[in-house]
């Protein structure tokens, strides 16, 4: 992080004009926006993938597991021992247990996707509805695409000052805080807001 970025973080933490209880959470979301976009895409791809688990898949999986004979009742050796072990596992409900496990994993993945998507929607709604076009573009390029302040200054059509870049990010964080406050009070999204606060605190303490 360069000197401009370091100064920017200090300004975001101490110079914002928004007065509400979600300023820290808004800054946390803004700082992790690019990561959230990547995580959401990865979770979506995983959810859209196959969650099928067949007996053939179970057999392939069991073949690769190192045998632990301490708990086996099978006394034979070699191929017959491996085959018997796999047969015992299959008859003992191995496929059903793995399917149940995968269903739990899919449900956990779905819930995590919904939460990450909610965080992204807070930001996208805030910048779309509460920012002007220039501020919105600056924020999305910096926090969404990871472009530096200098790069934004150099590549913005018509030019833009470093002060304008800093102000755009500050205004964006204020807008996100306002959106969080609105959702907490008016949209009955308290559970997500509390989860976000706990996530932020855990991140800060790590």
Q: PLM ranges: what are they?
A:
Residues 128-147:
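Short amphipathic alpha helix immediately N-terminal
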Residues 140-144, 157, 177:
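Short, locally clustered residues in the helix-turn-helix/winged-helix DNA-binding domain
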Residues 145-164:
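Helix-turn-helix DNA-binding module
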């Amino acid at each position: 992080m360069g000197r401009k970025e370091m100064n920017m973080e200090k300004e975001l933490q101490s110079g914002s004009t928004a007065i509400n209880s979600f300023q820290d959470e808004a800054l946390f979301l803004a700082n992790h926006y690019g990561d959230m976009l990547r995580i959401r895409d990865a979770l979506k791809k995983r959810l859209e993938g196959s969650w099928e688990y067949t007996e053939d898949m179970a057999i392939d999986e069991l073949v690769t597991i190192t045998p632990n004979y301490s708990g086996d009742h099978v006394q034979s050796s070699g191929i017959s021992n491996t085959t018997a072990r796999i047969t015992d596992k299959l008859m003992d409900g191995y496929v059903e247990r793995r399917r149940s496990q995968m269903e739990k994993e899919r449900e956990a993945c779905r819930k995590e996707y919904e939460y990450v998507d909610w965080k992204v929607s807070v930001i996208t709604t805030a910048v779309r509805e509460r920012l002007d076009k220039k501020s919105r573009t600056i924020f999305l390029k910096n926090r969404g695409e990871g472009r530096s302040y200098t790069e934004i200054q150099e590549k913005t059509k018509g030019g833009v000052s470093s002060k304008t870049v800093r102000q755009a990010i500050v205004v964006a964080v204020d807008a996100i805080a306002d959106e969080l406050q609105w959702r907490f009070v008016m949209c009955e999204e308290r559970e997500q807001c509390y989860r976000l606060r706990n996530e932020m605190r855990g991140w800060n303490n790590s």
